[in-house]
């Protein structure tokens, strides 16, 4: 326990003071409590509450929710591009800019906004529970939805920006497509003729992980790179690689071996892809 406390204190010494005033960023206790409550609700409390109740329909809510996340994800992508990726970043070795320049502060804001969006997306699983779609609450889904915001919190706390933010930008780009699909599918059968591209959604996920891994792997082949926290590079590489393997396994068993769209790929009552988003 003493070692954990010492590690925590050491990490917090490197906290970026520019992020201190943002919601959830003062201490990891609040966000950890939220995530633990989420895990408890979706794995235990929620199913017990709904056990003897009829499933909620929630169609109107899901339409608004999904299209709101389309808009939010689009905005996040735009802000990442305008705060470095389309201006000063080289797309190779890009250290975090800790200055108070307008562009650097803009990057801090969008890094936090991406983190906050991960907490909003916890509602994905809550919707599953309220609609009694318990089969969609897989280990991969819950693991991803809980671990990503927890780990990203630490990244935003000490290194909001730089080459470590590439995967967040790519993830938000993918979410534009994903939530567009989910929003349309929430309309029911009337929208099904326009959702022919659902079969490509898992492939888009896999491409996302390939892009993230390729980008971050550049670090290992550079003669020098002054990115401030190499541990973040290592974690992103591990994250991209592990989830590529998990999604590949999912693809194999669902599409190649099974020759079918698995039940776990359905959201809003329509065929889709597993709600186990990346990054």
Curated annotation (Swiss-Prot):
Species of origin: Homo sapiens (Human)
InterPro entries: ELO_CS, ELO_fam, ELOVL1
Protein name: Very long chain fatty acid elongase 1
Lineage, highest ranks first: Eukaryota, Metazoa, Chordata, Craniata, Vertebrata
Domain notes: The C-terminal di-lysine motif may confer endoplasmic reticulum localization.
Motif position, Di-lysine motif: 275-279
Keyword Lipid metabolism: yes
Coarse class of the protein's main subcellular location: endoplasmic reticulum
Broadest EC class assigned to this enzyme: transferase
Entry's Gene Ontology BP terms: alpha-linolenic acid metabolic process; ceramide biosynthetic process; establishment of skin barrier; fatty acid elongation, monounsaturated fatty acid; fatty acid elongation, polyunsaturated fatty acid; fatty acid elongation, saturated fatty acid; linoleic acid metabolic process; long-chain fatty-acyl-CoA biosynthetic process
Pathway, per record: Lipid metabolism; fatty acid biosynthesis
Known tissue expression: Ubiquitous.
Enzyme Commission number, as recorded: 2.3.1.199
Gene Ontology cellular-component annotations: endoplasmic reticulum; endoplasmic reticulum membrane; membrane
Effect in UniProt of substituting residue 165 to F: In IKSHD; loss of fatty acid elongase activity
Catalysed conversion reaction: a very-long-chain acyl-CoA + malonyl-CoA + H(+) = a very-long-chain 3-oxoacyl-CoA + CO2 + CoA; eicosanoyl-CoA + malonyl-CoA + H(+) = 3-oxodocosanoyl-CoA + CO2 + CoA; (11Z)-eicosenoyl-CoA + malonyl-CoA + H(+) = 3-oxo-(13Z)-docosenoyl-CoA + CO2 + CoA; docosanoyl-CoA + malonyl-CoA + H(+) = 3-oxotetracosanoyl-CoA + CO2 + CoA
Subcellular location: Endoplasmic reticulum membrane
Signal sequence region: none
Membrane topology (UniProt): Multi-pass membrane protein
Pfam families on file: ELO
């Amino acid at each position: 326990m003493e070692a954990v406390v010492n590690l925590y204190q050491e990490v917090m010494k490197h906290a970026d003071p520019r992020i201190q005033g943002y919601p959830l960023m003062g201490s990891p206790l609040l966000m950890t409590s939220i995530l633990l409550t989420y895990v408890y609700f979706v794995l235990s409390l929620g199913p017990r509450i709904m056990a003897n109740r009829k499933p909620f329909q929630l169609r109107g809510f899901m339409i608004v929710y999904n299209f709101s996340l389309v808009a939010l994800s689009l905005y996040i992508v735009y802000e990442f591009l305008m705060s470095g990726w389309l201006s000063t970043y080289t797309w190779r070795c890009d250290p975090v800019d800790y200055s108070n320049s307008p562009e650097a502060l803009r990057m801090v804001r969008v890094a936090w906004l991406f983190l906050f969006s991960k907490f909003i997306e916890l509602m994905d699983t809550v919707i599953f529970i309220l609609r009694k779609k318990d089969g969609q609450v897989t280990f991969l889904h819950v693991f991803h939805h809980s671990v990503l915001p927890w780990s990203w919190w630490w990244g935003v706390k000490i290194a909001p920006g730089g080459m470590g933010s590439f995967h967040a930008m790519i993830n938000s780009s993918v979410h534009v497509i994903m939530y567009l699909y989910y929003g349309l599918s929430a309309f029911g059968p009337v929208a099904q003729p326009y959702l022919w591209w659902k079969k490509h959604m898992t492939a888009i996920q896999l491409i996302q992980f390939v892009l993230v891994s390729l980008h971050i792997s550049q670090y290992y082949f550079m003669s020098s790179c002054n990115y401030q926290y190499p541990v973040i590079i290592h974690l992103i590489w591990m994250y991209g690689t592990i989830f590529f393997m998990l999604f590949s396994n999912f693809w194999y068993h669902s599409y190649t071996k099974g020759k079918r769209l698995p039940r776990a790929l359905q959201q809003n009552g329509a065929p889709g892809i597993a709600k186990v988003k990346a990054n």
